[in-house]
Amino acid sequence: MKIVKHIPNTITSLNLLCGILGVIFTFQGELSIAFYLMIAASVCDFLDGFAARMLNAYSDMGKELDSLADLVSFGLLPSLMIHRRLIEGGVTDFWAYVPVIICIFSALRLAKFNVDDRQSENFLGLPTPACAMWCGSLIYAADRGVMSVAGLLNERYIMIIAPLVLAALLISEIPMFSMKFKKGSEYNRLRLCFLGVIAASAIAVLALKINWSYIILLTFTAYIALNLIRALFAIRFSRK
């Protein structure tokens, strides 16, 4: 087998490495560093698929390895980050362990993705990287002391309720668009619109001199909201 065929799996392994290191730093209470590693893992997660397409290096092993890496980086890591933040905030009872549901439902979501032929172009349910990045950016903002809006509606309750909502979205049948661009303006219109939302959010955050983590938080909040709105409209028009 040519060396180039191993490039996607090597990048996937870097994704896994970032996830493992993120878990270690979370145990040490270094949540900001853990978030940086989550971002690095998400970059690797994008690049391994891109490399596989460019090099035509798809393999069954690569597909399974990608899911295993994603479970650590985007399932286990965000669960532990929220758990650690709750413990640091004085929540030491049952509620501190609610976030582990993200890891469990991420595993279910990844297993479903691997056997579901309907998700070759778009997703059914919230992608694990989107879930993880939403959680990670929230934790980072809290850890760096840049929370606003009354502690983001009381950070503690958000970090208990959000995992339950996200877990439901992970295994839902709600169609969610991917960011794979293809030929044809009709196919790419929604993706370009979403990129416009990201750009507008970035400009607003930078203009208001708000911490950069809010760009990520707003981006994935917008992604979830936009897909939910699309699903509601689809249900409404299907009944007519």
Segments predicted by a language model, with ranges:
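Membrane-interface helix caps and helix-loop-helix hairpins in membrane proteins
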Residues: N56-D60, E88-G90, N114-E121, V149-L152, ...
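Helix-coil boundary and interhelical linker segments in multi-pass alpha-helical membrane proteins
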Residues: L21-Y36, L76-Y97, L138-I158, L206-S213
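"…together with the soluble PPM/PP2C metallo-phosphatase catalytic core" -> "…together
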Residues: I3-I11, C18-F27, L31, Y36, ...
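Topogenic membrane-insertion module of multi-pass membrane proteins
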Residues: M1-F46, A200, V205, I210-N211, ...
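C-terminal membrane-associated helical module and adjoining short loops/tails
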Residues: L124-K240
